[in-house]
Regions:
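C-terminal helix-to-coil terminal segments
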Residues: 24-30, 322-360
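Positively charged, low-complexity intrinsically disordered leader regions
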Residues: 26-99, 103, 171
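Phosphate/diphosphate ligand-binding glycine-rich loop within oxidoreductases
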Residues: 79-184, 312
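Phosphate-coordination loops involved in phosphoryl transfer and adenosine-cofactor binding
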Residues: 81-86, 191-193, 301
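Glycine-rich phosphate/diphosphate-binding loop of Rossmann-like nucleotide-binding domains
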Residues: 91-103, 185-266
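Short, structured coil segments at secondary-structure junctions
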Residues: 108, 138, 158-159, 215, ...
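Rossmann-like adenosine-cofactor binding region
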Residues: 239-319
Length: 360
């Protein structure tokens, strides 16, 4: 089969899947009155949040706007998702992700069920498509935290209900949305602000790149040679940046990245699943530690960010993470509000615009 014919078949299949999801969603929300006191400007609809690319600039704007409204007026949304159920399958341990999804769903009037998959992969006992077709008959939305992005993409392909990426080896979209909500609260419009990320070009770095691009902001990512972000993610972010005016810089010098920046972000040098590389990484990454000396090179008003859990004494010192500049717990709190907005919008809480899906 030629590449063009194969691509056509994939496109046709993806289109049918979007129609199936929209039909299912419409059935769910028929006759339901929106619980929010006002419509959200520029609200989007997309079948899943597998990647930040699914949202695009309008979607990122909608999520962040609604998250701010929900944070300010939680009582207005207490029955927004009454009668709705979500299922969460986590192949990796979690504190913030699990509890913020559970608490968020309950605060919207719905229920959340958690399945611990840390002992085996989600598709270990049966075909992933079979799992998807079971789940779509029981719940309204599926949340996955997995080692492989392919697992999340496969679930989204087969399930007729929305699927949310709660972390994979490739992306962490919910985290990046919460991070930029935190920055918007601190600085307002991000158009003239710069985020410097130093460390491993991992899933968090990928989602920050894409979210920054959607917001038209500036991001500098400094990593050791060989640990740069995924080239396809970078290409996608730069494509979005052409539309929004965002500026993306990939560097190897952490000092160049941090100079004058408004926010300094780092993450673990060794992610879950990379334990065999820990000794080597611990030798390579020390120049990228965020300490008081590096923070001093940023703007005087700069904040320190970390998605947590932090390995104190490695990627960040106690003096920095415990300083007044640190907003790590604000980030953690905003996971709740960003994910509430995602749940609400993916379950039909606003006007729908044409779907935009990276995995379709």
């Amino acid at each position: 089969m030629s590449q063009s014919v194969a691509a056509g078949h994939r496109s046709q299949s993806a289109g049918m899947q979007v129609q199936k999801k929209e039909s299912t969603l419409n059935t769910h929300v028929q006759g339901r009155v929106a619980a929010a006191p006002e419509r959200v400007p520029q609200v989007f609809w997309c079948p899943d949040l597998v990647s930040t690319r699914d949202l695009g600039p309008a979607g990122v704007d909608a999520v962040l706007h609604l998250a701010g409204v929900m944070k300010a007026r939680p009582a207005d949304f207490r029955r927004a998702l009454t009668g709705r159920q979500i299922a969460m399958f986590f192949e990796k341990p979690s504190l913030r992700t699990r509890l913020t999804f559970e608490a968020g769903m309950v605060s919207l009037g719905g229920t959340a069920m958690f399945v611990d998959q840390t002992h085996e992969r989600l598709d270990a006992r049966e075909k992933l498509s079979d799992v998807a077709h079971n789940l779509e008959r029981w719940v309204d939305l599926i949340v996955l935290r997995t080692f492989s992005q392919q697992t999340i993409e496969g679930m989204a392909q087969h399930a007729s209900v929305p699927v949310i990426n709660a972390l994979s080896d490739l992306e962490h979209p919910c985290q990046a949305l919460a991070d930029y909500l935190t920055l918007l609260e601190r600085f307002g419009d991000m158009k003239d602000r710069c985020l410097a990320y130093v460390g491993d070009g991992n899933n968090v770095a990928h989602s920050l790149l894409l979210t920054c691009a959607c917001l038209g902001s500036t991001i500098r990512v400094a990593t050791p040679v060989g640990y740069a972000p995924d080239p396809q993610i970078v290409a996608d972010a730069r494509e979005i940046a052409e539309e929004t005016g965002a500026e993306i810089q990939l560097l190897t010098d952490p000092h160049e990245a941090v100079a004058g920046a408004d926010a300094i972000y780092t993450d673990a040098w060794t992610s879950m699943g990379q334990e065999r590389e820990e000794d080597e990484r611990t030798k390579i990454f020390p120049p990228y530690q965020v300490n008081a000396e590096l923070m001093a090179e940023a703007a005087p008003h700069a904040v320190f960010m970390h998605c947590l859990p932090a390995h104190r004494g490695l990627e960040v010192t106690d003096a920095v993470i415990d300083s007044p500049q640190s907003v790590v717990f604000e980030q953690a709190e905003n996971r709740l509000h960003a994910q509430k907005a995602i749940l609400y919008l993916l379950l039909g809480g606003g006007d729908r615009l044409p779907a935009r899906s990276a995995h379709a």
